[in-house]
Amino acid sequence: MTIRVGINGFGRIGRNYFRALLEQGADIEIVAVNDLGDTATTAHLLKYDTILGRLKAEVTHTADTITVDGKTIKVFSERNPADIPWGELNVDIVIESTGIFTKKADAEKHIAGGAKKVLISAPASDEDITIVLGVNEDKYDPAKHNVISNASCTTNCVAPMAKVLDENFGIVKGLMTTIHAYTNDQRILDFPHKDLRRARAAAENIIPTTTGAAKATALVLPQLKGKMDGISMRVPVPTGSATDLVVEVSREVTKDEVNAAFKKAAEGELQGYLSYTEDPIVSSDIVGDPSSCTFDSAMTMVMEGTSVKILGWYDNEWGYSNRLVDLTVFVGNQL
């Protein structure tokens, strides 16, 4: 069954999602997009992308549509999600990727408008469930979970790392630092922002800021509640990030044991989500990688047997958008 999808918010994640489903060949039809920009801009930014390059498709537009390789997509410009006529278009799933309507009460407006499910491309509030594929999708109940969060790109990276460590060695506590590409929430040049660090020029500074990714890991691995925390360091790259995770484990381990556990997981139950490399890679090497996390085995450290430091890379846009496509298929196949 082809899954009929509407996208609310055609920014970085909305457009990456569109490209990812085309590349995957997923059985998903985008029937409508809602975005406050005009269609000329929407079409142009879909066709041309600084990071991903030019879309290998013909893209045209009218006042209220964009057409990609002959497939016409309706474009709305509604500020209130309740005003988007998803029901008239028989939309199954809405991708809520504005970054604004992350509360359940707001996201549910899409369901009031006729959609069956809403997938939020961000951490959410009061959502029915947060899912990180490869970690907790077995908890999904289609009968009662209608507003679903895909968590954050960083949680999608750190949760598989934490899962492997906890299942194999037991996590006592942990601290995480994500070395994260800058995003549209930052400033190109110094300009006011509620976070005074993010008010500083993104391409000229290493910027410490907050992240809820470590704590959010407990949403998908409840046994880790209260055991993990972390910070983010925003760095001057447009995409390509890394998570540095330091944990105390419950028994003595070696570097080889840790690496072996990750290699086994990457080739087994987490295949497609967790990748494993022994190559000396850097951030640009991860751009365009669809994995949630690429485990860098050369960077593993163990001190005094129980203190473990590991590193996982992720394309914070492309990897995350591929998981959003996968989650659409996962949820859509159970409608």
From Swiss-Prot:
SUPFAM superfamilies: Glyceraldehyde-3-phosphate dehydrogenase-like, C-terminal domain, NAD(P)-binding Rossmann-fold domains. It comes from the Bacteria. It is an enzyme of class 1 (oxidoreductase). The keyword Cell wall biogenesis/degradation does not apply. D-glyceraldehyde 3-phosphate binds at residues 152-154, 183, 198, 211-212, 234. It is found in: Cytoplasm. It catalyses: D-glyceraldehyde 3-phosphate + phosphate + NAD(+) = (2R)-3-phospho-glyceroyl phosphate + NADH + H(+). Keywords: Cytoplasm, Glycolysis, NAD, Nucleotide-binding, Oxidoreductase. Inhibited by pentalenolactone. NAD(+) binds at residues 12-13, 35, 79, 121, 184, 316. Its main location: cytoplasm. Pathway: Carbohydrate degradation; glycolysis; pyruvate from D-glyceraldehyde 3-phosphate: step 1/5. Homotetramer. Belongs to the glyceraldehyde-3-phosphate dehydrogenase family. PANTHER family: GLYCERALDEHYDE-3-PHOSPHATE DEHYDROGENASE 2. This is Glyceraldehyde-3-phosphate dehydrogenase 2. It comes from Streptomyces avermitilis (strain ATCC 31267 / DSM 46492 / JCM 5070 / NBRC 14893 / NCIMB 12804 / NRRL 8165 / MA-4680).
